Amino acid sequence: MSKKITILIDAGHGGYDPGAIGIRGLKEKNINIEIALKLEKLLNHDKMFCTILTRHNDSYLSLKKRKQLLKKNQVNFLISIHADSSRKQNVSGASIWIVSKTRINREINNYLKNKSTLLFSKKIENIFKQNKNDFFLKKTILDLQSNNFQKIELDLSKEILKQLEKNTKLNKKYPNYASLGILSSINTPSILIETGFITNILEGKKLKTTNYQNKIANSIYLGLKNYFTKSSYILKK
């Protein structure tokens, strides 16, 4: 694979949006950016990857602006970093989420109805231009692409979960589905990683430490490395 894989690392929340609040006022946004920066460093030291961060510091970025970065930079994959919370302080562990089929179907239908301009592969762009009025063909192509993306998301999530399990408890051992805005791009495979529960006393304390943040970032990096080394993933053209 000669061309580098472009990963958009999204550090959830930021600025006036603290995200979840944990033990002793621990703010999710701070955990997210620390892990994101560590992951960025690991990926940028690997010739296979190049990275873009949605934020480099404690700044607020709207969902719309985060998603615009996917289009501007021809991103191959989105990793959104978050920390979880619960009213039950005994709940702990990491998990990974991918977009639900219901949500992605809605996004595809919205695109076809609104005919908005989004960044596709050149191959798909050309097909759409040649078949402007063929709704069924466009829908079929986007459905096939979303099915392919979902397989990528599932397989990658499993690789990352394998690595996370070596360093932390898993709240959910398999990828889960949700209707999350950050994951709803019809053009880019995306996953959201909940790195642990900041409302759990022990896990919250761990998530604050550089050592534990490094372990989480390294687990994500190794999962990405293992997946893309083994897979037949083809870059957008």
UniProtKB/Swiss-Prot annotation:
It is an enzyme of class 3 (hydrolase). It catalyses: Hydrolyzes the link between N-acetylmuramoyl residues and L-amino acid residues in certain cell-wall glycopeptides. Transmembrane segments: none annotated. CDD domains: MurNAc-LAA. Keywords: Cell wall biogenesis/degradation, Hydrolase, Secreted. One of its GO terms (cellular component) is extracellular region. The keyword Acetylation does not apply. SUPFAM superfamilies: Zn-dependent exopeptidases (SSF53187). Its EC number is 3.5.1.28. It comes from the Bacteria. The keyword Transferase does not apply. Its main location: secreted. It is found in: Secreted. GO terms for molecular function: N-acetylmuramoyl-L-alanine amidase activity. Residues 7-225 form the MurNAc-LAA domain. GO terms for biological process: cell wall organization; peptidoglycan catabolic process. Gene3D superfamilies: Zn-dependent exopeptidases (3.40.630.40). It holds the Pfam family Amidase_3. Cell-wall hydrolase involved in septum cleavage during cell division. Belongs to the N-acetylmuramoyl-L-alanine amidase 3 family. PANTHER family: N-ACETYLMURAMOYL-L-ALANINE AMIDASE (PTHR30404), N-ACETYLMURAMOYL-L-ALANINE AMIDASE AMIB (PTHR30404:SF6). This is Putative N-acetylmuramoyl-L-alanine amidase. It comes from Buchnera aphidicola subsp. Acyrthosiphon pisum (strain APS).
